[in-house]
Amino acid sequence: MINNSDTLKIGNKTFNSRLMLGSGKYRTIENAVNSIITSDCEILTVAVRRLPTKLTNDNTSFLKSLDWNKLWLLPNTAGSQTAEEAIRMAFLGHELACQLGQEDNFFVKLEVISDPKYLLPDPIGTLKAAEFLVKKGFTVLPYINADPMLALHLEDLGCATVMPLGSPIGSGQGLNNISNLQIIIENSSIPVIIDAGIGTPSEAAKSMELGADGVLLNTAIAQAKTPEKMALAMKLAVEAGRLGYLAGRMEKNRMQVQVLH
């Protein structure tokens, strides 16, 4: 980034990278580790449900091979169908963060998904879990549909960000509801992270050009033919989109305006 002061603040933490990555769906551990390093991301989300309660070198070689002085763990509650399940996963996520040396890490990516077919977030369950976790001192990053009113309610509850989906998780369909995403971005006083559905670097750049504060990716990199190359492409796309947003695009005109060069 050209402007080194253009940082992302979530809760009481400040980050230089606006690209966050997921940790699943990679073909090999080597692909995952190399992609994470290449991306220069600083926030890595991990599904608590897929991890053992006690981390050892044998059962979590992937996590143990990462530098947690450079990465901030974002435990997620994926697989939770109710608010109660998500709350339990959030507390387990904090325990896992402690085992990685991040005792002060109370971040949680809140996912309450009651529909196993389409994997769309449950707004009622999300609100219920978010209210409880915020009161317990968690830094809550809720995954939601692109619903402007829901985003405002979650902000009012004290969530640290909102994370509206671009399109259904893992679909690679891109940004299906740009109008609602723009409304959320314009109305939010907390960071807006576009999460889910981004499949290409151009879509990541577009998210940032809209004014989003960051993007979270997983499948687009993990399932690319060459994940490491896609990780670099996404890193550059997010940086380019952010710079383009800060620079301010030219005004659109109804017809060509002649300019003397």
From Swiss-Prot:
Keyword check for Protein biosynthesis: no
InterPro entries according to UniProt: Aldolase_TIM, Thiazole_synthase_ThiG, ThiG
Biochemical pathway: Cofactor biosynthesis; thiamine diphosphate biosynthesis
Reactions this protein catalyses: [ThiS sulfur-carrier protein]-C-terminal-Gly-aminoethanethioate + 2-iminoacetate + 1-deoxy-D-xylulose 5-phosphate = [ThiS sulfur-carrier protein]-C-terminal Gly-Gly + 2-[(2R,5Z)-2-carboxy-4-methylthiazol-5(2H)-ylidene]ethyl phosphate + 2 H2O + H(+)
Transmembrane segments: none
Gene Ontology CC: one annotated term: chloroplast
BP GO terms, sorted: thiamine diphosphate biosynthetic process
Superkingdom of source: Eukaryota
Family: Belongs to the ThiG family.
Name under which the protein is recorded: Thiazole synthase
